[in-house]
């Protein structure tokens, strides 16, 4: 949420007239978006996961992270903007549109669902896959991120 402020000083003269000063320059402040919530993560086939999360108001998009067992860290795997999903290429350090993954918005339940392909190459049958998400807004060309959601686990 963006807040803009203007300040104008005033005072009362001896003859009880109100005297106003000049208006200040516009000052603005941005609040971080709310922490998103992953409502469910389900397996979908052998290498896909269906992720559903609650939508937030005034949010530009969401970034999805997956836990990598090889590095023991969460890795950015993609982002959702509107009804589009973008995969993240860590070598090129940029997002590319993934036309295979469909984003479904449910206005009644206030949720977004997306099916993504997992990036873990060492796929094992009973391995757990962990996901977390954060939302962001854009302000003056910069992205302002929320806190990360609690991680959700799906067992393959």
Residue locations for each model-derived region?
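Short, surface-exposed beta-strand/loop patches at domain edges
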Residues: 111-113, 135-136, 150-151, 156
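Exposed beta-strand and adjacent loop surfaces of beta-rich binding modules
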Residues: 48, 59-63, 128
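An aromatic-rich alpha-helical recognition segment common to small helix-rich domains
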Residues: 5-9, 36, 51-53, 64, ...
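Residue-level signal for short segments within beta-strands and strand-turn junctions
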Residues: 9-11, 31, 47, 66-70, ...
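Beta-strand-rich modules
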Residues: 1-16, 120-141
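Recognizes extended acidic, P/S/T-rich segments that occur
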Residues: 1, 63-124
């Amino acid at each position: 949420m963006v807040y803009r402020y203007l300040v104008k000083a005033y005072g009362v003269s001896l003859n009880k007239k109100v005297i106003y000063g000049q208006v200040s320059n516009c000052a603005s402040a941005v609040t971080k978006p709310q922490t998103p919530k992953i409502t469910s993560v389900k397996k979908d086939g052998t290498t896909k996961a269906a992720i559903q999360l609650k939508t937030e108001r005034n949010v530009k998009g969401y970034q999805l992270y997956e836990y990598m067992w090889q590095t023991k860290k969460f890795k950015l795997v993609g982002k959702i903007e509107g009804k589009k999903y973008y995969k993240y290429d860590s070598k090129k350090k940029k997002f590319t549109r993934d036309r295979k993954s469909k984003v479904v918005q449910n206005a009644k339940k206030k949720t977004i669902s997306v099916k993504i392909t997992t990036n873990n190459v060492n796929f094992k049958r009973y391995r757990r896959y962990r996901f977390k998400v954060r939302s962001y807004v854009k302000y003056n060309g910069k992205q302002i991120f929320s806190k990360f959601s609690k991680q959700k686990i799906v067992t393959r």
